[in-house]
């Protein structure tokens, strides 16, 4: 993981002020949990950090590198942030096997085949889902699908891993 710092983040959806002056620092090696009732901004916070949402105010750095500066309308692309987000819905490709789902992003990065295979099998082993490698998402339980989504996120060796509703299954 890396040091991440958010300062004075504001996010609106229309007139709805979802994130109000959010400031937090997560140090390298920390584990942080966002707790709160439905609709309080937990998922929005993850989406801002990951680059899927742009706040109206505030800044964010990862390891001292600016990722968000709303005043300057600067927003680093999600692919430049060195992180992965596992969605509550898992977002698995239904027409791809577990192998293909986990390997997809690694192929997009144009990694060598032997490196893709190494990372694939390491992620499968870490999540204890080796026996599902040739199955499709609809052949898996919700908990198994969740582990595939986490394995896919871990396979790219992110500096930061964001999990939305990780205990839902």
Q: What is each residue range found by the language model?
A:
Residues 1-169:
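ABC family nucleotide-binding domain
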């Amino acid at each position: 993981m890396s040091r991440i710092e958010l300062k004075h983040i504001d996010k609106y959806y229309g007139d709805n002020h979802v994130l109000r002056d959010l400031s937090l620092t997560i140090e390298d090696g920390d584990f942080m949990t966002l707790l709160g009732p439905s609709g309080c901004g937990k998922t929005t916070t993850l989406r801002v950090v990951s680059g899927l949402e742009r706040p109206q105010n505030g800044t964010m750095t990862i390891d001292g590198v600016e990722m968000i500066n709303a005043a300057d309308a600067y927003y680093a692309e999600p692919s430049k942030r060195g992180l992965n987000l596992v969605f509550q819905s898992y977002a698995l490709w239904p027409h791809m096997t577990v192998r293909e789902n986990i390997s997809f992003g690694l192929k997009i990065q144009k990694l060598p085949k032997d490196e893709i295979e190494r990372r694939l099998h390491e992620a499968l082993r870490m999540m204890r889902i080796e026996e599902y490698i040739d199955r499709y998402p609809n052949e898996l339980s919700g908990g198994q699908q969740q582990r595939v989504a986490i394995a896919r996120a871990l396979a790219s060796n992110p500096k930061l891993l964001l999990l939305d509703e990780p205990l839902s299954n």
